[in-house]
Amino acid sequence: MNAIDTQNLEKHTPMMRQYLTLKAEHPEMLLFYRMGDFYELFYDDAKKASELLGISLTARGKSGGDPIPMAGLPYHAVEGYLAKLVQLRVSVAICEQVGDPATSKGPVERKVVRLVTPGTLTDEALLQEKQDNLLAAVYHGKSGYGYATLDISSGRFVVAELASTEALEAELQRTNPAELLYSEDFSEMGLISGFNGKRRRPEWEFDFDTSQKLLLDQFGTKDLRGFGLDNARLSLQAAGCLMQYVKDTQRTALPHINSIVRFNQSDSIVLDAATRRNLELTVNLQGGHENTLASVLDNTATPMGSRMLQRWIHEPLRNQQQIESRQSALTEILDTNLFETLEPQLKALGDVERITARLALRSARPRDFARLKQAISLLPEIQQSLANCQSAHLHHLARMLGEFPDELELLERAIVDNPPMLIRDGGVLKEGYNAELDQWRALSQGATDYLSELEAREKEQTGISTLKVGYNRVHGYYIEVSRRESDLVPLSYQRRQTLKNTERYIIAELKEHEEKVLSSQGKALALEKQLWEQLFDQILPKLHDLQLFAQGAAELDVINNFAERAETLNYSCPTLSQKSGIHIEGGRHPVVEQVSQTPFIANPVTLNPARKMLIVTGPNMGGKSTYMRQVALITLMTHIGCYVPAQSAVIGPVDRIFTRIGAADDLASGRSTFMVEMTETANILHNATTESLVLMDEIGRGTSTYDGLSLAWSAAEYLAQKIEAMTLFATHYFELTQLPELISNVENVHLDAIEHGDTIVFMHAVQEGAASKSYGLQVAALAGVPGKVITAAKHKLHHLESRDTNSAVDSMTTSNQQSMVFDEPVNSALNDALDKIHPDELSPRQALDILYELKRLTS
C-alpha cells in the first residue's frame, strides 16, 4: 500500500508537496487536482477512483522508492464522474489552478474551490430531481436524540427531539439522508451502520452555545423562541453541527436558509420504520421505486411537486381542518375539470425551488435565469385559471404564487432566449442591455466593416483579384491569396500559413487589429461577468417571495395531481369522523390493482368500538396481506388529503399505524427472523393506543407450535382487551378463531377459496366468520412441491387431525414418526385404486363395486 508520506515533504517534488499539503486539509475526500486539461488523483485516492469510476491506474514519480499511483480524468467530463461518486456517497474536493502559469515561479498556485459532498449538492446534474437530497446530523444526549435535516437545494431546515432509538430509526427511514453527521462519541453506531454517507465530526461542533450562536447569526434574530425551539437543546446541537458543516463546504452566504421548523410527531400519524418499509410507501421491499404508493399517486407536473408529494406520504396529517382544506381544493379542481387546464401550465414552471436555492448560493447558471424568466412569465396565466375558484385553500395558494413584474422585465431585457450553459462562454446578456458591453462586443467580433474596407483597399493596391481577409481560431486573422497570384504579394506581407492552393499572410495593420479584438474579447467577457453578478444582487431581494412561489406552486401541483389521479383511477372522497373506527366499502389496494393481470376484488372493512379486532384467516395466497395493507394505505391516503380507492370510506381519528408483516433475518445485527418479529411486536405492544391501526400478520411462526400459538394468542388478547387498538390480526393458528367467543370486541373474517378436486381457486373475497381450513397442501402443490411429498403430507395431516392438539404435537416430535413421513405408503395398491377414482363420474352401481374392491384391498 502506498501511504502518503507527509512527514518528509522535502523528499518530494514542489508540485507533489503542493498536492500533499492540500490533501492533508481534506483527508476524508477524494482530491481532484487540476493539471492542465485533467484532474489528477494520487496515492490511495487514485486507487479508489480507479475502482469506483473504472478509470486507468498508472504511476507518476516515486515515494519511498515505490511508484506513486495516479489516475486522471478530463476536466470537461468531470460532472459525469462527480454524479457517479455522489451516487456512491463519496465526497470530492476540487482543486483548481488560480495562479498565472506565465508569472508563477515553481508550481502554479492552486486552491480547493469547491467541495462536493452527497448532502450538500445544488448542481442540477448531480441531484435526483424527484427526491429530496438531505444533509442530516444526529446528537445523543441523556434524554434522547437531537436530529436535524437540511435540504440545501431548497433551504428547508427541520429539527426533531426524539426520545427513543425506535423514534430515531423511524426518522432515519422517513428522511433517508444522503449524508449523516454524527459526533465522535456517538454510542449507537448500530443504528446508523447501514448509511454509506456517514461523516464523523468533532465534539466541539455539537457544543450548545456555539450551535445557538451560529443559528442566531444565520437567522438574524435575538433568540429562537419564534421558531418554537424552546426546550429543544439536543436538536439545536445537531442543527449547529449541520450549519457549521454547510458553511465549511459552501464557503458563501446562505440567505435562503432563513427559518427552521420543529417537527412534532403529534402533528402527524406516527409511522415506525417497519411500517414505512412494509407498506412500500416510496421504496419497495427490493429497494427500488417501482410498484410503490408514490409511483401510483405521482403524476405531478413539476419535480418540486413530486418531492412534496413524497414528504406528504411520509407525514400524514392528524389535523382534520388541514386535511379537509386540501380535500376541498381537490374536489373543486376535480368537479370543474380544472386539472386539465392547470397541468400544462404547471409543467412549464420547471423546478423553481432549486433554481431559487442556486440563486441564493450565487451558483445559478444562465439557463436557470432563463427558466426563472419563463416561470414567472406564466404566473398571470395560472392566477387567471384560479381566479373563479371558491376554495379558500386555492385562494391561499394563488396568493403564495405572487407577482414579479419588475423581475420579469429585468430578465427579459437581460437574458437571451437560449443562453449558453456557462457565463464563461459569454453571449448570455442581450444586445442593448448595456451600451459599453455592446461596444466591446462589436470590436471583439472583428468590426466587419473595417475588415471589408481593408480587403477592398489591399485588392486595389496589389492588383490581386483573389485576395481575401479571413479568421480562424488557430491562426487568427490573415490575408489569403491564391498560389498562382502569390508572386504579386508585397514585401510587407509576412507568410503565416501555406495550404495546397493558397498562401496566407499577415500585415502589421491586421496584426494590430487582431490584438485589439482579442483584448476586447477579454474585456467584453470580464464586463459581462460583472453585469452577471449584479443580476444576482437585483433578484435576491425577492428571495423570500420566490421561495413562497415555489412552495405554493408545488402544493398546487400535488393537489391538482390528486384530482387527476382521482378521475383516472376511480377514487372517491373519504369522510373524516370524530368517532372512533374505520368503515370502508369496496376498498382496493392502490398498487396491486394497477399491476394485477386480473380484475381486483374490492372488499369492505368495519372497525369500531364494538368491533376492534378482526381475526383474519384463509389460505396462503388468498389475499390476507393485501387486504390488511389496503386498509392501512386507504387510511394513510385519507390523511394526506387524497381521494381513496374505495366506494366509500369513513375514517375516524388515527394516531399511529403499525405493521408486523413478513420478516427476514437481520444479518448485520445478528438477529434471526423470529427475533426481528418479536422486536417489532414488542414495539407495537408498548406504543399502540386505542386510536392506533395495527396490522399483525402470522405472529409466532418462527418457533415451536406451542410457543408460537401462545405468543399469538396473548398478543391478540392484549391488543383487544388492554390496548383496544383497531387491529387486523392474520393467522394460521385456527385456535385464535375462538377469541370472539371470549372477547366481545373481536370478530372473525376470512378470505374465501373454492376447492375442486386437488385444485384450489382463490376468490380474494372477504367473508364474515372463520375459514374452514388453510389449504396449505393445495398451495404447496401449486408451488411445484413433488407429488410424493404432497401424498405423504396428506397422510400425516389425516393422522394429526384424528388426534387432539397435544398428541399431534407429540407425534411430530418423535424420531420414528419423523423418519417415516417420506416412506412409501404401506398399502400402495389401495392408494393406487383411490387415485384412479373420479367420484363425479361414477354411477351408483360403479360406486358400490369400487367399495367392495377397496374392502378387499384392506383385508
Swiss-Prot record:
Going by the entry's taxonomy, the superkingdom of the source organism is recorded as Bacteria
Which cellular component appears as one GO term in the record? cytosol
What biological-process terms (Gene Ontology) are attached? mismatch repair
Q: Which InterPro entries match?
A: DNA_mismatch_repair_MutS (IPR005748), DNA_mismatch_repair_MutS-lik_N (IPR007695), DNA_mismatch_repair_MutS/MSH (IPR017261), DNA_mismatch_repair_MutS_C (IPR000432), DNA_mismatch_repair_MutS_clamp (IPR007861), DNA_mismatch_repair_MutS_core (IPR007696), DNA_mismatch_repair_MutS_N (IPR016151), DNA_mismatch_repair_MutS_sf (IPR036187)
Keywords assigned: ATP-binding, DNA damage, DNA repair, DNA-binding, Nucleotide-binding
MF (Gene Ontology): ATP binding; ATP-dependent DNA damage sensor activity; damaged DNA binding; mismatched DNA binding
Residues holding ATP: G618, P619, N620, M621, G622, G623, K624, S625
Main role?
This protein is involved in the repair of mismatches in DNA. It is possible that it carries out the mismatch recognition step. This protein has a weak ATPase activity.
Family (UniProt): Belongs to the DNA mismatch repair MutS family.
Q: Which PANTHER family does this one have?
A: DNA MISMATCH REPAIR PROTEIN MSH1, MITOCHONDRIAL, DNA MISMATCH REPAIR PROTEIN MUTS FAMILY MEMBER
The name of this protein is: DNA mismatch repair protein MutS
Organism of provenance: Shewanella sediminis (strain HAW-EB3)
